[in-house]
From Swiss-Prot:
Record: residues binding succinyl-CoA: L125
Record protein name field: Arginine N-succinyltransferase
Species whose genome carries this gene: Shigella sonnei (strain Ss046)
Disulfide bonds: none
Single annotated GO MF: arginine N-succinyltransferase activity
Record pathway: Amino-acid degradation; L-arginine degradation via AST pathway; L-glutamate and succinate from L-arginine: step 1/5
Family affiliation: Belongs to the arginine N-succinyltransferase family.
One GO term (biological process): arginine catabolic process to glutamate
Record function comment: Catalyzes the transfer of succinyl-CoA to arginine to produce N(2)-succinylarginine.
Amino acid sequence: MMVIRPVERSDVSALMQLASKTGGGLTSLPANEATLSARIERAIKTWQGELPKSEQGYVFVLEDSETGTVAGICAIEVAVGLNDPWYNYRVGTLVHASKELNVYNALPTLFLSNDHTGSSELCTLFLDPDWRKEGNGYLLSKSRFMFMAAFRDKFNDKVVAEMRGVIDEHGYSPFWQSLGKRFFSMDFSRVDFLCGTGQKAFIAELMPKHPIYTHFLSQEAQDVIGQVHPQTAPARAVLEKEGFRYRNYIDIFDGGPTLECDIDRVRAIRKSRLVEVAEGQPAQGDFPACLVANENYHHFRVVLARTDPATERLILTAAQLDALKCHAGDRVRLVRLCAEEKTA
């Protein structure tokens, strides 16, 4: 059975293995053991209440409960940009016009922005390619919403998610090549590694401070503004079905889109509810997959179960209860895994 749980110190080697499979561009999961160990420590201290809000971040892993194999990772940053500035480009417009010459040009322009400062962030989502089956990707991504719903007071009103931009298998980023490299004088893989290992001071020092007309970029770079890496397209679709939208903010390095949503408008948060759980044999039938989570802050767990999402009393097997660290009579959080498709 696949279970979501908080990260532990012993997971570091498994996270190193996952990091080696990302193919680059996942800044927050570098193949660097010291950085990953520090990330785990920060998550543990967050759960223990030892960090200020500006440093808090939760990390979860997807584990096969039978073998102990760690198949994926996901994380939530509580409030971005309160220590180090959190940069985006806002894709806007500048108009240049002359009535006398009968010229009017509305030019797409990139403006350096810190507009998402203080937002909570969904980040570090990666599922081992060998485990991309049977709803594991949905479970990994959406489990975070169950945690946010259960512990709403820990998070801010807006949630953002940076989507990985277009990068090829050799680490070539058209957006970086045409823009960032001119200011930073280093390859994309190098800047990606520096950010992932926490060395971010250079961003503020070297970033272009003035608006940039996108027409000055190569056509290849213009074409990838707000576009996602092919492997990231499913993750984008998942978030958009939960209510997230692209509001013309992009990543400063690869040009990938930043999606955002008010936390209380996220479908899985808004529609999740508490039900009593009982032990038994679940009813047979054509039921949809649902997310089921306990309400235990320090021992949080999420699993998938096929059940009636409208039930008031959820019947789970002994194995499911054990995976959730629950007992009969406890209250668990329940929501349909995917939004119901509207029928005409």
